[in-house]
Amino acid sequence: MPLATTLGTLVLLLLLPLPRGAEVTGDHSNVALDYGALEGEEGTEQQLHYHDPCKAAVFWGDIALDEDDLKLFHIDKAEDWTKPSIDKPGHDTGGLEETSARWPNDTASNASIQAPRKDGKDATTFLPNPGTSNTTAKTFSARVRRATTSRTERIWPGGVIPYVIGGNFTGTQRAIFKQAMRHWEKHTCVTFVERTDEESFIVFSYRTCGCCSYVGRRGGGPQAISIGKNCDKFGIVAHELGHVVGFWHEHTRPDRDQHVTIIRENIQPGQEYNFLKMEAGEVSSLGETYDFDSIMHYARNTFSRGVFLDTILPRRDDNGVRPTIGQRVRLSQGDIAQARKLYKCPACGETLQDTTGNFSAPGFPNGYPSYSHCVWRISVTPGEKIILNFTSMDLFKSRLCWYDYVEIRDGYWRKAPLLGRFCGDKIPESLVSSDSRLWVEFRSSSSSLGKGFFAVYEAMCGGDITKDAGQIQSPNYPDDYRPSKECVWRITVPDGFHVGLTFQSFEIERHDSCAYDYLEIRDGPTEDSTLIGHFCGYEKPEAVKSSANRLWVKFVSDGSINKAGFAANFFKEVDECSWPDHGGCEQRCVNTLGSYTCACDPGYELAADKKTCEVACGGFITKLNGTITSPGWPKEYPTNKNCVWQVVAPVQYRISLQFEAFELEGNDVCKYDFVEVRSGLSPDAKLHGKFCGSETPEVITSQSNNMRVEFKSDNTVSKRGFRAHFFSDKDECAKDNGGCQQECVNTFGSYLCRCRNGYRLHENGHDCKEAGCAYKISSAEGTLMSPNWPDKYPSRKECTWNISSTAGHRVKITFSEFEIEQHQECAYDHLELYDGTDSLAPILGRFCGSKKPDPVVATGSSLFLRFYSDASVQRKGFQAVHSTECGGRLKAEVQTKELYSHAQFGDNNYPSQARCDWVIVAEDGYGVELIFRTFEVEEEADCGYDFMEAYDGYDSSAPRLGRFCGSGPLEEIYSAGDSLMIRFHTDDTINKKGFHARYTSTKFQDALHMRK
């Protein structure tokens, strides 16, 4: 059973073992509060001050303590940590034995405490082994006060846990979080509700420390539950929520040695603390037995030195079987029982989450017992309402229903508005909730008993909603919506406001015209109001804003395919920029859905208060040509500058930008200082490039008559900056596509027409007509496209591509887009790939449909592609990139063949970080002869940087014939058997020309092998 915290000790935060790939950083601060991104949906962030579980004053392995915890736990200078541990005799189980470490009075060896450093990096203080001394290490002692009084503030009042989901999570991740919360609600009396004005609540956030959470209610404001990299799995989130509810890890309970054995020698160094157990006074198991099946239990190999080494070994049961531990699928029966005890859930009642259901008084219709107490929590999809009908009612009748009664409240708990209290034998009228939850409570205290009651409920999707803000979701979200549903919501906000609607997630059966399942939105109160849009598919619709205070939303599903559906937030929207003070903005106010931002005119930038403007570099330019430079050119530019130039040319002109000098801080990432160039004047216009470093960008030409150039520097390193010249040229292609039938390419002072793949230019220079499309390609890399890409390919078309690469390098095809008429056997339109020079070679695959094929790699230096379309359906086609991969299996024959170190040998030096293995195989009875024509590889005394190795066999386990680097001719290399392996390795710095060799098969098998 997971350890529920004793009410007096719910104070620690617990960092969980991370899943594979999760990142951990040591960015710990002395302040356990952080500013996190928060929002109602993706994309619109605000700042929230919350307790950050990744920032702690002291770390004990995976347990972190903040300043309040240090005071409560009396962390002092070293006392108990350095005392020799007292070993106790182990239990005879017939297996591995050890004396489990006690927390905090003794510790495993090499344990460590992580304390914060000013530079944000890990600072680890290693605790000395018992009996050793370490005068330089700063050590700590933890003396935990036993729980002597209750601390009820650590339990969530009424079992209600308000939550907020941070703005950096996707719709899929949000759905997982909600599924995990509904799972806890389904089996316990804990309730998760979206936060309104509650002071204490949890915030789902993406933190660098991976998966972690406080244990129980922290109090004093919001607290984060970190769902970091690779943590967004249902079981992991449910586990984290277990900590929020108030559970420790199961294996740390005081009686764990009776059930599991800790194998200390298999634990990763420095992670021993994760296996310390607590004292009986520090936690309470509430009388529940040890639960191997708990979702809060570590797995057998958690924090193991190797994936197949056990760190926790369950003891055998009566049948000699070791129980399974570490499941992350669902709450165990023990988890459920303990949570119900911790939150004092009524023994009678349950959480009902189906769209229809029924419930009755205990013992119905044979009579209910005295002093019964039952609670039913009905929870359906947000945006739905609940219709509750009593079909039978027979309760002891009293004035004001004082003794026996059933009470219905319009919400999620006992303090929600009362819809009615009933007793006697009169059946109540139908009750309808105002939202998606109902609370039903039954109590009996009289000795005069009746039959009880029976009630049925049904979820009703859609309806009239009159409130400032809320949420609507497809029926059964986040699970698949149900077939044949029609839901209509009529949303009304106060007069003078607009309705704003933003989507958190969206997945509705896809169709070109949304003919099957769809979401329809209209600007007004009825189905005759102006249509805003019909939506389906998997892309979230843009945010919607009504023209008045009403919005009509309709969801329809047919009888077949069902998807996850949608979740959307609605709210009253006002244009803050229409206020007399324009939102406090000095120059320009930009209204956004649900908020607004201030902006400045060209030549100005926002000051630190984000409302006033100050003079800046950049400006608004209307000249046909000119020069722009970074601030201070040719001297170093200043720090913390943001300059925007908006260049505008006459209509039908295009603007070209040519950099004459360029030197900025940064590299390929460009996250410090950079120059951004866009077609258009807005900061979200089409991006041509983001540039930094010392490499001069290519000439950039705008797509319209506007160009935006933005320069930004951070607060550290400054460089010389840049100087660029811009000039404008009339774009003949801007009007009527220049008269070109397909593509028009603007050139300086003129233009030319061009045809798409599969077509050729007519003699008139403007029209295109179909042509054969058989291509021979010998370049190392490039792009392939179906005919007429990106429009639909023509019917009755056959195209071939014969791709050949440098000898010794395999051709690779990677698809970026793919859409060809679907057929189970690809009998109609299809793309075929062959492992050779023509269609007689072995076939690598035939593809059709809309799923992108995985990358295809030939076994040799040739690959043949054949595209075929029939006379009927046409689709968009495909776009792919061809490249090369080094290495592979080569066949040595009497005829001489070539081998090159890299595909662009002769044109470019070999690349960095190359790892190439070639296996050259001759026929039985023959050996391999390798003769180098050119050899130029970075030189080093031991050939430790770049090198070529030869092995007398199929792999690197064969005898090595030598490792080679430097320049100059090498002697011939002969194999003793029928195979020779060549390995080429390069590091990440100096690159040279490479090597060119010829190989052939030979009967000269007793030749001298070349010495290193």
Swiss-Prot record:
Biased composition (Polar residues): 126-135
UniProt record, GO biological process: cell differentiation; negative regulation of skeletal muscle tissue growth; proteolysis
Major location (coarse): secreted
Entry-annotated residues carrying Omega-N-methylarginine: R960, R963
Pfam families: Astacin, CUB, EGF_CA, FXa_inhibition
Binding site for Zn(2+): H239, H243, H249
Disordered, as annotated region: 83-135
Active site per the UniProt annotation: E240
Glycosylation positions in this chain: N168, N358, N389, N625, N802
Co-factor(s): Zn(2+)
Residue span(s) of domain CUB: 348-460, 461-573, 617-729, 773-885, 886-1002
Disulfide bonds: C189-C345, C209-C231, C211-C212, C348-C374, C401-C423, C461-C487, C514-C536, C577-C589, C585-C598, C600-C613, C617-C643, C670-C692, C733-C744, C740-C753, C755-C768, C773-C799, C826-C848, C886-C916, C943-C965
Matching Gene3D superfamilies: Collagenase (Catalytic Domain), Laminin, Spermadhesin, CUB domain
PROSITE patterns: ASTACIN, CUB, EGF_2, EGF_3, EGF_CA, ZINC_PROTEASE
Signal sequence residues: 1-21
Protein name: Tolloid-like protein 2
